[in-house]
From Swiss-Prot:
It is found in: Cytoplasm. The gene is hisB. Keywords: Amino-acid biosynthesis, Cytoplasm, Histidine biosynthesis, Lyase. It comes from Saccharolobus solfataricus (strain ATCC 35092 / DSM 1617 / JCM 11322 / P2) (Sulfolobus solfataricus). This is Imidazoleglycerol-phosphate dehydratase. It comes from the Archaea.
Protein backbone atom coordinates (compact mmCIF):
# COMPACT_ATOMS: atom_id res chain seq x y z
CA UNK A 1 0.00 0.00 0.00
CA UNK A 2 1.48 3.32 -1.06
CA UNK A 3 0.36 6.32 0.92
CA UNK A 4 1.03 9.14 -1.47
CA UNK A 5 -0.62 12.16 -3.05
CA UNK A 6 -0.09 14.56 -5.92
CA UNK A 7 -1.91 17.85 -5.29
CA UNK A 8 -1.92 21.03 -7.38
CA UNK A 9 -3.43 24.30 -6.20
CA UNK A 10 -3.59 27.16 -8.66
CA UNK A 11 -5.07 30.57 -7.91
CA UNK A 12 -4.69 33.99 -9.51
CA UNK A 13 -1.83 34.56 -7.05
CA UNK A 14 0.14 31.30 -6.97
CA UNK A 15 0.63 27.85 -8.44
CA UNK A 16 1.65 25.18 -5.95
CA UNK A 17 2.43 21.53 -6.72
CA UNK A 18 3.12 18.93 -4.05
CA UNK A 19 4.08 15.32 -4.69
CA UNK A 20 4.36 13.40 -1.43
CA UNK A 21 5.03 9.78 -0.48
CA UNK A 22 4.96 9.37 3.30
CA UNK A 23 6.09 5.73 3.25
CA UNK A 24 9.21 6.00 1.12
CA UNK A 25 12.28 7.86 2.29
CA UNK A 26 13.83 9.44 -0.74
CA UNK A 27 14.70 12.68 -2.39
CA UNK A 28 13.22 15.93 -1.11
CA UNK A 29 13.13 18.81 -3.59
CA UNK A 30 11.68 22.21 -2.72
CA UNK A 31 11.49 25.26 -4.94
CA UNK A 32 9.79 28.43 -3.73
CA UNK A 33 10.93 32.05 -4.17
CA UNK A 34 11.67 32.29 -0.41
CA UNK A 35 15.13 30.89 0.53
CA UNK A 36 14.56 30.41 4.26
CA UNK A 37 11.12 28.86 3.63
CA UNK A 38 12.79 26.36 1.27
CA UNK A 39 15.19 25.45 4.09
CA UNK A 40 12.32 24.92 6.56
CA UNK A 41 10.24 22.83 4.13
CA UNK A 42 13.25 20.63 3.33
CA UNK A 43 13.80 20.25 7.08
CA UNK A 44 10.16 19.29 7.72
CA UNK A 45 9.97 16.77 4.88
CA UNK A 46 13.39 15.25 5.62
CA UNK A 47 12.50 14.64 9.27
CA UNK A 48 9.20 13.11 8.11
CA UNK A 49 11.34 10.51 6.26
CA UNK A 50 9.30 11.14 3.13
CA UNK A 51 9.84 11.57 -0.57
CA UNK A 52 8.58 14.95 -1.67
CA UNK A 53 8.63 17.53 -4.41
CA UNK A 54 7.25 20.99 -3.62
CA UNK A 55 7.13 23.62 -6.35
CA UNK A 56 5.71 27.10 -5.81
CA UNK A 57 5.34 29.94 -8.29
CA UNK A 58 4.32 33.41 -7.15
CA UNK A 59 2.27 35.02 -9.94
CA UNK A 60 1.83 38.31 -8.06
CA UNK A 61 4.96 38.74 -5.94
CA UNK A 62 3.69 41.31 -3.44
CA UNK A 63 5.29 39.58 -0.48
CA UNK A 64 5.75 36.09 0.96
CA UNK A 65 2.27 35.66 2.47
CA UNK A 66 0.53 34.04 -0.52
CA UNK A 67 3.30 31.52 -1.14
CA UNK A 68 3.54 30.51 2.53
CA UNK A 69 -0.22 30.15 2.92
CA UNK A 70 -0.79 28.28 -0.35
CA UNK A 71 2.11 25.88 0.23
CA UNK A 72 0.70 25.16 3.71
CA UNK A 73 -2.76 24.50 2.27
CA UNK A 74 -1.45 22.24 -0.49
CA UNK A 75 0.94 20.30 1.75
CA UNK A 76 -1.82 19.84 4.32
CA UNK A 77 -4.18 18.50 1.65
CA UNK A 78 -1.44 16.16 0.38
CA UNK A 79 -0.94 14.64 3.83
CA UNK A 80 -4.68 14.31 4.38
CA UNK A 81 -5.10 12.63 0.97
CA UNK A 82 -2.12 10.29 1.48
CA UNK A 83 -3.48 9.10 4.84
CA UNK A 84 -6.86 8.08 3.39
CA UNK A 85 -9.14 6.64 6.09
CA UNK A 86 -6.20 6.66 8.55
CA UNK A 87 -6.64 2.96 9.31
CA UNK A 88 -3.86 1.61 11.49
CA UNK A 89 -2.00 4.87 12.11
CA UNK A 90 -0.57 5.62 15.53
CA UNK A 91 -2.46 8.96 15.28
CA UNK A 92 -0.80 10.82 18.18
CA UNK A 93 2.76 12.03 18.67
CA UNK A 94 4.79 14.60 20.52
CA UNK A 95 8.39 15.70 20.22
CA UNK A 96 10.59 18.03 22.24
CA UNK A 97 13.47 19.16 20.07
CA UNK A 98 16.51 21.26 20.99
CA UNK A 99 18.50 23.39 18.58
CA UNK A 100 21.26 25.10 20.50
CA UNK A 101 19.47 27.71 22.69
CA UNK A 102 15.99 26.79 21.40
CA UNK A 103 13.76 24.08 22.82
CA UNK A 104 10.39 23.49 21.15
CA UNK A 105 7.55 21.10 21.92
CA UNK A 106 5.21 19.85 19.20
CA UNK A 107 2.21 17.68 20.04
CA UNK A 108 -0.30 16.54 17.45
CA UNK A 109 -3.39 14.44 16.87
CA UNK A 110 -4.38 13.34 13.37
CA UNK A 111 -7.99 13.87 14.40
CA UNK A 112 -9.68 15.29 11.27
CA UNK A 113 -10.23 18.41 13.40
CA UNK A 114 -7.72 20.83 11.95
CA UNK A 115 -6.57 23.58 14.28
CA UNK A 116 -3.28 24.97 15.56
CA UNK A 117 -2.14 26.62 18.76
CA UNK A 118 1.26 28.22 18.23
CA UNK A 119 3.26 29.89 21.00
CA UNK A 120 6.58 31.09 19.58
CA UNK A 121 8.47 34.23 20.61
CA UNK A 122 10.01 35.28 17.29
CA UNK A 123 11.96 38.50 17.83
CA UNK A 124 13.31 39.04 14.32
CA UNK A 125 10.77 40.27 11.80
CA UNK A 126 12.26 38.50 8.77
CA UNK A 127 14.73 35.74 7.91
CA UNK A 128 15.86 34.97 4.36
CA UNK A 129 12.78 36.47 2.71
CA UNK A 130 10.32 34.94 5.18
CA UNK A 131 8.35 37.29 7.43
CA UNK A 132 8.32 35.55 10.79
CA UNK A 133 4.65 36.48 11.29
CA UNK A 134 3.97 33.94 8.52
CA UNK A 135 5.50 31.05 10.49
CA UNK A 136 2.48 30.63 12.83
CA UNK A 137 0.24 31.25 9.82
CA UNK A 138 1.96 28.38 7.97
CA UNK A 139 1.33 26.02 10.90
CA UNK A 140 -2.31 27.15 11.21
CA UNK A 141 -3.07 26.77 7.48
CA UNK A 142 -1.26 23.42 7.38
CA UNK A 143 -3.13 22.06 10.41
CA UNK A 144 -6.54 23.20 9.18
CA UNK A 145 -6.10 21.63 5.74
CA UNK A 146 -4.49 18.39 6.95
CA UNK A 147 -7.12 17.82 9.63
CA UNK A 148 -4.49 17.77 12.36
CA UNK A 149 -4.81 19.25 15.84
CA UNK A 150 -1.41 20.84 16.36
CA UNK A 151 0.24 22.45 19.38
CA UNK A 152 3.64 24.13 19.08
CA UNK A 153 5.22 25.74 22.14
CA UNK A 154 8.62 27.31 22.60
CA UNK A 155 10.05 26.18 25.93
CA UNK A 156 13.25 28.23 25.71
CA UNK A 157 15.46 30.09 23.29
CA UNK A 158 16.30 33.52 21.91
CA UNK A 159 17.60 32.90 18.37
CA UNK A 160 14.67 33.23 15.96
CA UNK A 161 16.28 30.98 13.32
CA UNK A 162 16.85 28.22 15.88
CA UNK A 163 13.32 28.49 17.29
CA UNK A 164 11.72 28.21 13.85
CA UNK A 165 14.00 25.38 12.72
CA UNK A 166 13.40 23.40 15.93
CA UNK A 167 9.65 23.80 15.29
CA UNK A 168 9.87 22.40 11.76
CA UNK A 169 12.13 19.53 12.87
CA UNK A 170 9.78 18.64 15.72
CA UNK A 171 6.76 18.75 13.42
CA UNK A 172 8.49 16.49 10.89
CA UNK A 173 9.44 13.93 13.55
CA UNK A 174 5.96 14.02 15.10
CA UNK A 175 4.30 13.54 11.71
CA UNK A 176 6.58 10.60 10.96
CA UNK A 177 5.70 8.90 14.24
CA UNK A 178 1.95 9.65 14.14
CA UNK A 179 1.54 8.39 10.56
CA UNK A 180 3.22 5.01 11.19
CA UNK A 181 1.01 1.96 10.72
CA UNK A 182 0.85 0.07 14.02
CA UNK A 183 -2.13 -2.23 13.39
CA UNK A 184 -5.28 -2.49 11.24
CA UNK A 185 -7.57 -0.53 13.56
CA UNK A 186 -9.14 2.91 13.35
CA UNK A 187 -7.74 4.58 16.48
CA UNK A 188 -10.98 6.20 17.67
CA UNK A 189 -13.86 5.30 19.97
CA UNK A 190 -16.15 6.57 17.19
CA UNK A 191 -14.83 3.99 14.72
CA UNK A 192 -13.89 6.75 12.27
CA UNK A 193 -11.38 9.58 12.19
Amino acid sequence: MSRSANITRETKETKIEVLLDIDRKGEVKVSTPIPFFNHMLITLLTYMNSTAIVSATDKLPYDDHHIVEDVAITLGLAIKTALGDKRGIKRFSHQIIPMDDALVLVSLDISNRGMAFVNLNLKRSEIGGLATENVPHFFQSFAYNSGITLHISQLSGYNTHHIIEASFKALGLALYEATRIVDNEIRSTKGII
